[in-house]
Swiss-Prot record:
Phosphoserine sites (modified residues): 114
Tissue-level expression: Highly expressed in ovary and testes.
InterPro entries recorded: Papain-like_cys_pep_sf, Peptidase_C19_UCH, Ub_carboxyl-term_hydrolase, UBA, UBA-like_sf, Ubiquitinyl_hydrolase, UBP13_Znf-UBP_var, USP_CS
Catalytic activity: Thiol-dependent hydrolysis of ester, thioester, amide, peptide and isopeptide bonds formed by the C-terminal Gly of ubiquitin (a 76-residue protein attached to proteins as an intracellular targeting signal)
Start-end of UBP-type zinc fingers: 187-295
Annotated positions of the Phosphothreonine modification: 122
UniProt function note: Deubiquitinase that mediates deubiquitination of target proteins such as BECN1, MITF, SKP2 and USP10 and is involved in various processes such as autophagy, endoplasmic reticulum-associated degradation (ERAD), cell cycle progression or DNA damage response. Component of a regulatory loop that controls autophagy and p53/TP53 levels: mediates deubiquitination of BECN1, a key regulator of autophagy, leading to stabilize the PIK3C3/VPS34-containing complexes. Alternatively, forms with NEDD4 a deubiquitination complex, which subsequently stabilizes VPS34 to promote autophagy.
Stored SMART domains: UBA, ZnF_UBP
Domain USP: 336-861
Name of this chain's protein: Ubiquitin carboxyl-terminal hydrolase 13
A cellular component annotation (GO) from this entry: nucleus
UniProt lineage: Eukaryota, Metazoa, Chordata, Craniata, Vertebrata
Species, as recorded: Homo sapiens (Human)
Length: 863
């Protein structure tokens, strides 16, 4: 095996208590029962500490337990030893040194370094032409820190040698967790660091590409060595082509090519002809810049001809990222960036905002010793541990240090370079919080708002004692429904975690400019001329707030006063104000062609926000409540049978309809549920289901089978005992509420009948006098995947009511045409100035684009 051969050519380690050759076998004998060879399915962590972001690149290296295969930095390995008694660890360390200089002053050319055997990312800040890497491995025995240099094939027992070799050759643990989830995780090309690029003056235009040999205009690949544009073949893209890109490689030997039309600020499709597989190029931006391509301004289209929306987005990308402005990097505690794992910017932006809130800082980082000391044996699978790890990584300043001054670099490089790690990789955190979620566990771009609610749900489910930091977002919404004919009203309350503001397009203050721009744009498109400068709709924030507070019609409203359907209107007000108010601008909608689109608007979001006028007032004098009577719906037996039979076996779901909906930008699981609950009646019917249900808290949750009859009884024990713990399956609740019954009524009926749908319907018909149980309040969380049930008077500060006056302290912006594509960044106000967090880059903001945000975070101003 190549890695084993590389390891066995490596010199011994240094710095600990070394053993004489004759003592090694005797020393290991007591520990042999604890040393394991990794089996299939074991997760071997050799790149990242379970409690910190230490790695083999760190000064203290990384210790891998030879029993659990968990990894620990120097500050945390003793904790694991004390807790488990495991004594044998493999210590991994990567050294970075300056290359030996030749007589002319340049670095001597070297062959491929055989001393590299760890699968680690290289330091992007170091020029690989000037530095070389050397990996070191050794066994360390605790508590005396005896060191056994590797390789030591003659002295070590065979089992230990095999175990060491298996650990070093193991693959990423994230692939083993769920192969389907991480199928898009690509290897870094071995040619990326030292790729030769010819200085031949080639510059690639932004469009109009064609193959240099056959004039094809699709499936084109740019060779990153000489800039040749040639057509591909089925080997990677499954598209048509004559294989000229592959022929060019065979003629010239230039290994890497990037597919034109896939280049975005987040990356591109790169193929290695030599390695014969898709790869990652960590220096892709530099390699493309060699041919005049700026990744920050690229947006993927198949043939390079930019559509209308693509052209409009250019300005958006530049403004939000503050391109063209020399931004000053910031370092230290609270100024640590998060590396992009490939469309993980939605997660990074939300977590930066979350950990700028003192309550989250105290709950996790403030309790770090206790959380780490009492973490389970596998801390990689514990939410609170991973939240604390991430929070400490962001707030400690340990991974955000300014570069060393040039004179100090010279002194350091004479011996050994000690690289400063800037930015942390949230791979372990993302793997855990997205586990079992079909969307967040993928490498696709996601909606930051949906992830925020998903995170709130995880915080709720994993609260630390009575402390729940997500309570700062929690508030009550009062919904008032009025029968237009009788004027009688009904008041209900629900829990929410964010305020969704509609975009009041009709209130644009520059309508004349917009009309003129649209005419000019269409004329330019028709005549194939350059498009005019973008004119963005300017929407007053007050208009959006007014649209939020205006009454809305209730479809199919059944008036209990009339005992019949009638016109009804609903208004929403705040029954309580949260400590931190999250405002989402509803920029995304659907066109007449079902294609998702984004409102490209500018909204004058205020720094100071006062919404006290939206405080709920409850039942007013003179108002009369609607009778609490259920609709007298009679369902014939044959209709019940049809209802049961329309739910098909999940294995029979029409996948073609699912994919039609998914291509419109809807979450895959939502599409599957839409097709399932509409009985495979086609994409159009399923689309209507999506439109009706897309605001529901479990919209993007995986499809789970409801129980009927005996199956429901058997499944009841899975969901818990009766009472508050027995939450009925959401699918059955949705079926009953779709018939016109109240949600609370449906839940109480299902609980009374052990989640049996037929018996629940009979129960409802036999209890027309249904009254809501006063012992509990059903709260429909606006959450990505949970409905939380709490008592009417819950223990602890579940709602932190107060003044409705707020100050803006953070906002998340989205660039692109859909939440399923594009890029997110975050701006946070710290120490009196705005800071931009763009993945791993953290800089002082010069022009924070507060008018183009997607999610806004406000903190209450004490009254």
């Amino acid at each position: 095996m190549q890695r084993r051969g590389a390891l066995f050519g490596m010199p011994g380690g240094s710095g600990g208590r070394k053993m004489a050759a004759g003592d090694i076998g005797e020393l290991l004998v007591p520990h042999m029962p604890t040393i394991r060879v990794p089996r299939s399915g074991d997760r071997v962590y050799k790149n990242e500490c379970a409690f910190s972001y230490d790695s083999p690149n760190s000064e203290g290296g990384l210790y891998v337990c030879m029993n659990t295969f968990l990894a620990f930095g120097r500050e945390h390995v003793e904790r694991h030893f004390r807790k488990t008694g495991q004594s044998v660890y493999m210590h991994l360390k990567r050294h970075v040194r300056e290359k030996v200089r030749g007589a002319s002053g340049g670095a001597l050319p070297k062959r491929r370094n055989s001393k590299i055997f760890l699968d680690l990312d290289t330091d992007d800040d170091l020029n690989s032409d000037d530095y070389e890497y050397e990996d070191e491995a050794k066994l360390v025995i605790f508590p005396d820190h005896y060191e056994i240099a590797l390789p030591n094939i003659e002295e070590l027992p065979a089992l230990v040698t095999i175990a060491c070799d298996a650990v070093l050759s193991s693959k990423s643990p994230y692939r083993k967790q769920d192969p389907d989830t991480w199928e898009n995780e690509l290897p870094v090309s071995k040619y990326a660091n030292n790729l030769t690029q010819l200085d031949n003056g080639v510059r690639i235009p932004p469009s109009g590409w064609k193959c240099a040999r056959c004039d094809l205009r699709e499936n084109l690949w740019l060779n990153l060595t000489d800039g040749s544009v040639l057509c591909g073949k089925w080997f990677f893209d499954s598209s048509g082509g004559n294989g000229h890109a592959l022929e060019h490689y065979r003629d010239m030997g230039y290994p890497l090519a990037v597919k034109l039309g896939t280049i975005t600020p987040d990356g591109a499709d790169v193929y290695s002809f030599q390695e014969e597989e898709p790869v990652l190029d960590p220096h892709l931006a530099k390699h493309l810049a060699h041919f005049g391509i700026d990744m920050l301004h690229m947006h993927g289209t198949e043939n390079g001809l930019q559509d209308n929306d693509i052209k409009l987005r250019v300005s958006e990308w530049e403004v939000i990222q503050e391109s063209g402005t020399k931004l000053k990097p910031m370092y230290g505690p609270g100024y640590t960036g998060l590396k992009n794992l490939g469309n993980s910017c939605y997660l990074s932006s939300v977590m930066q905002a979350i950990f700028s809130i003192p309550e989250f800082q105290r709950a996790y980082v403030g309790n770090l010793p206790r959380i780490f000391d009492y973490s389970p044996l596998d801390p990689t699978q514990d939410f609170n541990t991973q939240m604390t790890k991430l929070g400490h990584g962001l707030l400690s300043g340990q991974y955000s240090k300014p570069p060393v001054k040039s004179e100090l670099i010279e002194q350091v490089m004479k011996e050994e370079h000690k690289p400063q790690q800037n930015g942390i990789s949230p791979r372990m955190f993302k793997a855990f919080v997205s586990k079992s979620h079909p969307e967040f566990s993928s490498n696709r771009q996601q909606d930051a708002q949906e992830f925020f609610l998903h995170l709130v749900n995880l915080v709720e489910r994993n609260r630390i004692g009575s402390e729940n930091p997500s309570d700062v977002f929690r508030f009550l919404v009062e919904e008032r429904i009025q029968c237009c004919q009788t004027r009688k009203v009904r008041y209900t309350e629900r829990v929410d975690y964010l305020m969704q503001l509609p975009v009041a397009m009709e209130a644009a203050t520059n309508k004349d400019e917009l009309i003129a721009y649209e005419l000019t744009r269409r004329e330019a498109e028709a005549n194939r001329r350059p498009l005019p400068e973008l004119v963005r709709a300017k929407i007053p924030f007050s208009a959006c707030l007014q649209a939020f507070s205006e009454p809305e019609n209730v479809d199919d409203f059944w008036s209990s006063a009339l005992q019949a359907k009638s016109a009804g209107v609903k208004t929403s007000r705040f029954a309580s104000f949260p400590e931190y108010l999250v405002v989402q601008i509803k920029k995304f909608t659907f066109g007449l062609d079902w294609v998702p689109k984004k409102f490209d608007v500018s909204i004058d979001m205020p720094d100071l926000l006062d919404i006290n006028h939206l405080r709920a007032r409850g039942l007013q004098p003179g108002e009369e409540e609607l009778p609490d009577i259920s609709p007298p719906i009679v369902i014939p037996d044959d209709s019940k049978d049809r209802l049961m039979n329309q739910l098909i076996d999940p294995s029979d779901i029409d996948e073609s309809s699912v994919m039609q909906l998914a291509e419109m930008g809807f979450p895959l699981e939502a599409c599957r549920k839409a097709v399932y609950f509409t009985g495979n009646m086609g994409a159009e019917v399923a689309f209507n289901w999506i439109i009706v249900h897309m605001e529901e808290p479990d919209f993007a949750e995986p499809l789970t089978m409801p129980g009927y009859g005996g199956a429901a009884s058997a499944g009841a024990s899975v969901f818990g005992a009766s009472g508050l713990d027995n939450q009925p399956p959401e699918e059955i609740v949705a079926i009953i509420t779709s018939m016109g019954f109240q949600r609370n009524q449906a839940i109480q009926a299902l609980r009374a009948t052990n989640n049996n749908l037929e018996r629940a319907l009979d129960w409802i018909f036999s209890h027309p006098e249904f009254e809501e149980d006063s012992d509990f309040v059903i709260e429909m969380e606006n959450n990505a995947n949970a409905n939380i049930i709490s008592e009417a008077k819950p223990e602890g500060p579940r709602v932190k009511d107060g003044s409705g006056t707020y100050e803006l302290f953070a906002f998340i912006s989205h660039m692109g045409t859909s939440t399923m594509s594009g890029h997110y960044i975050c701006h946070i106000k710290k120490e009196g100035r705005w800071v931009i967090y763009n993945d791993h880059k953290v800089c002082a903001s010069e022009r924070p684009p507060k008018d183009l945000g997607y999610m806004y975070f406000y903190r209450r101003i004490p009254s």
